[in-house]
Regions:
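RNA-binding basic/glycine-rich loop and surface signature characteristic of RAMP-family CRISPR effectors
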Residues: 1-293
Length: 293
C-alpha cells in the first residue's frame, strides 16, 4: 500500500550564522555559489545552500531514530552503518547484488532505507525523499522565491574571522578582526581583498549568511508506505525541534527555525507506530542490513 505524494514548502530562518563552505581563496573560505539567470538575462553568482546539505542533516536524524528502535549499536558491518548514516558507497561485491525480494524486504523493515535510499550491496537504492535547494531571500532570487527581498546578494553575507589556536583557553575568537574583505565583480563572483595592515598569522576568515537570513526550500516524499510516512514525520518533527544546517555546527553556526507546510496534510490518525513495528522485527532487519555489505 502506498500513500499520496506529500510536499512541504516553506522557509528556514537563520538563528545563528550559516556556513556552507565551497572553495578557499587566500584566507577566506567562501560560501557555495551558483549562477542565477536574472529577469533581464544576465548571469549573477548567488550563494545557495545545496539540497544535499539539508538532506544529509535529515538523514542523520533518521539514522539516530532507527538506531534507537533497532538497537544495532556496534552490531553492523561498517558498510551497512555508512549506508544508513552517510548514504553508503557503490563498490564491487563478491555476492549477488541486492535486488528483487531481498531489496523489497530491506525497504519494508528499515524505513531509513525506504525514505532516504542508500548505496550498498552492489546497487543504488532510490529513496522516496527529494529535497530542494535552500535559496536565500535576496533581490537576485525574488523571481524564484517570490519573496520581495530588498537586500542584494552582493551585501547579504558577512566575513567572520577566527584564529587557528585551539579552544582550550579563553580566547575571544569573535573579537578577531577580519584580515580580508570581499570585493564583488559585476557578476557577483567574490574576490578576497587582503587588508595590508592586518596580520595574517594564525587567522582565517569564513563567509557566512548572517543571523536573520530567510531561505526558501521544499521537501517531497514520493508515494511513501504508511510506515515510511510515519517515520519521516518523526524525523521532520525531531529536526524541527533542534534544526541545524551547513557546517561548523560545533562552534555555534547553523541553527535555523523551520516553517514548512505540507500539501496534502498527512492523516491525523491511522498511521502505524513505526518504532514498535520496526523493533518487533529487529532481528530480521539486522539480517536484511547485512545485504548492504
Amino acid at each position: 500500500m502506498t500513500l499520496p505524494t506529500t510536499r512541504w514548502d516553506g522557509t528556514l530562518t537563520a538563528m545563528s550564522s550559516i556556513s556552507h563552505a565551497s572553495d578557499t581563496r587566500g584566507t577566506i573560505t567562501l560560501l557555495r555559489r551558483e549562477l542565477i539567470v536574472q529577469p533581464g538575462g544576465q548571469l549573477v553568482h548567488v550563494p545557495i545552500v545545496s539540497g544535499n546539505t539539508l538532506r544529509g542533516r535529515l538523514r542523520r536524524v533518521g539514522e539516530e531514530l532507527v538506531r534507537g528502535a533497532l538497537g544495532y549499536e556496534g552490531r553492523l558491518q561498517p558498510a551497512a552503518a555508512h549506508a544508513l548514516r552517510g548514504g553508503g558507497s557503490l563498490a564491487k561485491t563478491s555476492h549477488e547484488p541486492l535486488s528483487g525480494s531481498r531489496l523489497a524486504l530491506l525497504r519494508e523493515l528499515v524505513p531509513q532505507i525506504g525514505v532516504f535510499g542508500a548505496a550498498g550491496g552492489g546497487t543504488i537504492i532510490d529513496g522516496a525523499l527529494a529535497v530542494g535547494k535552500v535559496v536565500p531571500h535576496v533581490v537576485e532570487t525574488n523571481h524564484i522565491t517570490g519573496a520581495g527581498a530588498t537586500v542584494s546578494a552582493f551585501s547579504a553575507t558577512q566575513i567572520e574571522a577566527y584564529t587557528r589556536q585551539d579552544d582550550a583557553g579563553s580566547h575571544d575568537f569573535t573579537a578577531v578582526a577580519p584580515t580580508a574583505d570581499l570585493l564583488f565583480g559585476a557578476d557577483g563572483d567574490p574576490q578576497p581583498a587582503p587588508k595590508p595592515e592586518a596580520s595574517q598569522q594564525m587567522r582565517f576568515n569564513v563567509e557566512t549568511f548572517p543571523v536573520g537570513t530567510v531561505f526558501s526550500t521544499w521537501l517531497r516524499l514520493h508515494r511513501p508506505s504508511p510506515l515510511e510516512l510515519a517515520f519521516f514525520l518523526d524525523v521532520l518533527d525531531t529536526f524541527t525541534r533542534d534544526a541545524r544546517l551547513g557546517g561548523r555546527i560545533a562552534i555555534g553556526h547553523g541553527q535555523v527555525r523551520v516553517n514548512l507546510s505540507p500539501d496534502p496534510a498527512p492523516p491525523a490518525v491511522g498511521l502505524p507506530d513505526w518504532r514498535a513495528t520496526t523493533a518487533a522485527r529487529a532481528n530480521e532487519a539486522l539480517d536484511a542490513l547485512a545485504g548492504l555489505t
